[in-house]
Design a protein with these regions (language model features):
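Solvent-exposed loop/turn and edge beta-strand elements of beta-rich ligand-binding domains
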Residues: 1-193
Length: 193
């Protein structure tokens, strides 16, 4: 009896991918914060997916599973798949073997609220026409530049509200908002807060 075994049956491969965080530049230790699960299925008809017990190595934001069998014991190719366990506070998008984790509330909206006080002997004022408020924001990302936000506040008596403002920039850095008032003839302006 003869058995012919292909010479490549013991070949090994590696599986790699990347990890991207969109959360305002927070520092992460991928090796301890992320759980990647590696599975494989033989291309032999009727094969069932099985979990591979393996720990990836990390080089920055690139992971690699090393020394993986390329073929099963009968010479059928293995197909490998990597999934990431959910991380609290993040939404994960998988693109092939690459993962992008974005803070879950990146699309959260906020309001900026303040009040206008007139010290002028009780004169009547229409804040919606007499006052021009300018809203600016700066990302907390180092090197960011202040930008004007084109939005008009709503007024309820002496209280103004800038509504539905973006809390984070596209990279997950918090925005800091600031309100200024254009000068009004005959008045000096003092900002509190």
């Amino acid at each position: 009896n003869f058995t012919n075994t292909m010479s490549e049956i013991n070949d090994k491969i590696e599986i790699s991918g990347t990890k991207t965080w969109i959360d305002g530049g927070k520092t992460h230790n991928n090796a301890t914060e992320i759980t990647l699960v590696l599975t494989r299925t033989s291309t032999k008809p009727g094969s069932v997916e099985e979990t591979v017990v393996a720990t990836p190595t990390w080089d920055g934001n690139t992971y690699t599973f090393n020394d993986l069998a390329k073929y099963d014991t009968e010479g059928y190719l293995y197909e490998y798949k990597v999934v990431e366990n959910a991380i609290d506070g993040y939404t994960t998008v998988q693109d092939g073997r690459n993962f992008i984790n974005t803070i879950s509330d990146i699309n959260e909206k906020i309001n900026v609220i303040g009040t206008k006080t007139w010290i002028d002997g009780g004169r009547e004022h229409d804040n919606t026409t007499e006052i021009t408020l300018v809203l600016t924001r700066t990302s907390t990302k180092p090197g960011s530049v202040e930008e004007t936000v084109e939005v008009t506040p709503t007024w309820n008596g002496s209280t103004y509200t800038f509504s539905n403002l973006t809390k984070y920039d596209a990279e997950g850095y918090l925005y800091t908002y600031k309100v200024a008032e254009n000068p009004i003839d005959g008045y000096t302006t003092k900002v509190n807060g």
